[in-house]
Amino acid sequence: MTNSKYAAFVALDPFFDIVMQGLAGAVDGDHYFEAIADDAVFEYRYVFPGFPSEIEGRDALMALYSRYGDSTVLHSGDALIVHRSQDPRVVIIEYEVHGKKISTGNSYDNRFISVVTIEDRKIVHWRDYMDSLAAFTAETGPRA
């Protein structure tokens, strides 16, 4: 899904691809960032030193993700399951991403559940849950 406008985010392409597949038909935009409202709120329900628990706005999210490729490169996303909520604005997606931590050379395999609220075909709220232990182990475990 990479184009020159989003070349700095190429390390996240498998994430973008699996998420956009899960939100197909519910959001507008060819790229993940195009599907996000300018004032969207992102909540991260896990704690890592230096990582925020909440981000407000698409530009702030892009700034947060801009250096992702310095630490992690994803090579695939899979295991997508899409759940529809009683609230028609809410889509719940389960998915996995796989890649490698650059600092350790360790495999990075993680599972996510994202609760996504959509209004006017744009993401306005994103609540993210993941396997924190998998991320911590990939980052701090013995080098591959």
Predicted regions and their residues:
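Short, low-complexity N-terminal intrinsically disordered segments enriched in polar/charged residues
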Residues: 1-35, 140-144
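A solvent-exposed, acidic/Ser-Thr-rich amphipathic alpha-helical stretch
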Residues: 9, 30-89
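A beta-strand edge to alpha-helix "cap/lid" segment located at domain peripheries
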Residues: 2-6, 66-144
